[in-house]
Structure formats: C-alpha cells, structure tokens
C-alpha cells in the first residue's frame, strides 16, 4: 500500500461520469462528464490547491481570531489563515480519511475527529459519494457527536466548478437574493440584499469581478450553474441556506469555488444557523454535481 501527498486515491466510472477521491481530507480530486472536467482536478501526488475538493467540518469558512464561546466557556482555535487572523475551514480537510466501502458506483470514507482542548467533542465524519448516469455525483457529508455534551457544528465542502477557460469567461447562475458583507479580513459585517454588481440571479459572465462572498436568501432546493458561452459546464444543487462563491484569484482564477454551507462565516460567534449537535446525533449535508 503506497501513500502520496494526498494519501491514496479511489476511482470509479458510471455511464459518462468518472470520479476520483483522495483520502487526505476525503477530497474530490477529479470529476468528469463525457471526458470533460467538471471540477478543478489534482493528482494524488500533489497537495490539493486552495482546499480543492476538501470536506469542511466542524465549521466552514472563518472564525474571527480563532475565538468562540460555547455554553459559557471560551475556546481558542489555532489560526491557520495568517493573513486574516482567522481559523479557517474546520479540522477535517488535512487529516487522513479511510475508505470503508467501495463498489463500482459508490465509495464511503470515514474519519475520526479527536476531541481537543479547543474543540472538546469527538466526532465521526462520513462521506458518501455515489455516481449516477443521469443525476451525476450525489454527495452526503455527515458527522456524529461521540461526546457527552452538545457540540457547535457546521459543514461544507470546497469544489471548484469549471465552465469557461477561466472564471473570467464563465457564466454564473446563482439564485441568491442576499449577500454577507465583509471587512478586510473577510469577516461578516452584515447581511443585505445583493447589490447589482454581485447579483447573478440573471445569468451573466463574471469578467474580472473579484468574488469571495457568502450568499443567502436561497429558497428550497437551489442550483448554481457555471458554464461557458455555449452552455457547457457544471451545476451544483443543494438546499443549504448559504453558499460561498470565490473566483480563486490566488490560483489564477481557473474556476469558481462553490461551497454550500450550513451556516455563514463566523457562525461560532454569531450563532446564525449554527447546529447544536446533541450527543449521539448525526447531522447530514446533501448535494449533487452534474454536467451540462
């Protein structure tokens, strides 16, 4: 058994879809439809660029100064984004996950997230990836609280969808009516109706617009589409109340990060849509990615 920078890799193929997943962070390292990349790919021998494909829990996005309070106790998380002084994207993205079940169309990975001083609730995390020839890749990310007290919890994942040759010539369709305004550290300052510059309810080209924003006002089952001018690209569907959109500028804008989130940034402090995960309770986040 050999290991690489991103652990080990599992691949499967159903109909026109093919999938690869790596064991570090349970990262989706490749998803293709009719031979065309739907997400930004990377090799198992490489470190995933910009959190690409990673599972984000027990919190998505940022926690200000790494500090939060829960049940009248204060906690201090490690700061892993020095530029903003924040704790970013949880505890599961860079740890080993284990492939516990695999078939021709499905793979399940699991990971144990140990209790630590700054997050003293042990969790078991589970990722189910299932390929369907019609609906594409169906995903369920879940976690169970193994501790003896309620745990603060949120989740997301971090695929970069590909439409045009870059984000600039990609057309974005995003049915969100509100946006989270942020400060210089990308931390929330308010939730407001989306301004014209960031409104993609009518699909349009991104051009050189910088986006690193959380959107809300999503209704029921929603779908975000990223395509080229010919309508070819990828669509992500979920029913989370929030989605982070990012133009991946540090990577050269190769695609668009579409991160369905159960809560907005800094939810450990604001409490907005933060899950109180009871002992023995399992939380589930579902979504799908398809080609078009």
Predicted segment positions?
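Extended, loop-rich substrate-binding clefts of extracytoplasmic carbohydrate-active enzymes
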Residues: 1, 81, 85-133
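Short, Gly/Pro- and small/polar-rich lid/capping loops
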Residues: 1-15
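Acidic-aromatic substrate-binding/catalytic surfaces of carbohydrate-active enzymes
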Residues: 20-74, 80
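Active-site/ligand-binding surface loops and adjacent short beta/alpha elements
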Residues: 77, 150-152, 160-238
């Amino acid at each position: 058994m050999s290991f690489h920078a991103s652990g080990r890799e599992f691949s499967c193929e159903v109909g026109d879809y093919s999938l690869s997943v790596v064991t570090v962070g349970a990262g989706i390292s490749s998803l293709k439809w009719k031979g065309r990349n739907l997400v930004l790919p990377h090799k198992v021998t490489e470190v995933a660029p910009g959190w690409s494909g990673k599972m984000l829990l027990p919190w998505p996005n940022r926690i200000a100064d790494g500090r939060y309070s829960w049940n009248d106790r204060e906690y201090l998380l490690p700061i892993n984004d020095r530029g903003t002084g924040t704790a970013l994207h949880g505890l599961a993205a860079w740890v080993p996950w284990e492939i516990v079940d695999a078939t021709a169309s499905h793979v399940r990975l699991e990971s144990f997230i140990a209790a630590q001083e700054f997050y003293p609730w042990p969790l078991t995390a589970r990722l189910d990836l299932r390929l369907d020839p019609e609906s594409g890749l169906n995903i369920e990310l879940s976690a169970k609280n193994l501790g003896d007290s309620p745990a603060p919890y949120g989740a997301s994942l971090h695929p970069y969808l590909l439409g045009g040759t870059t984000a600039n010539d990609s057309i974005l369709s995003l049915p969100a009516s509100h946006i989270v305004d942020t400060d210089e550290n990308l931390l929330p300052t308010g939730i407001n109706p989306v301004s014209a510059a960031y409104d993609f309810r009518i699909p349009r080209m991104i051009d050189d617009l910088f986006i690193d924003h959380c959107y809300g006002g999503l209704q029921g089952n929603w779908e975000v589409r990223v395509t080229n001018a010919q309508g070819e690209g990828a669509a992500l569907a979920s029913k989370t109340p929030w989605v982070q959109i990012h133009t991946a500028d540090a990577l050269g804008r190769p695609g668009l990060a579409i991160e369905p989130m159960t809560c907005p940034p800094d939810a450990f402090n604001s409490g907005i849509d933060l899950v109180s995960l009871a002992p023995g309770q399992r939380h589930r986040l579902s979504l799908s990615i398809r080609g078009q």
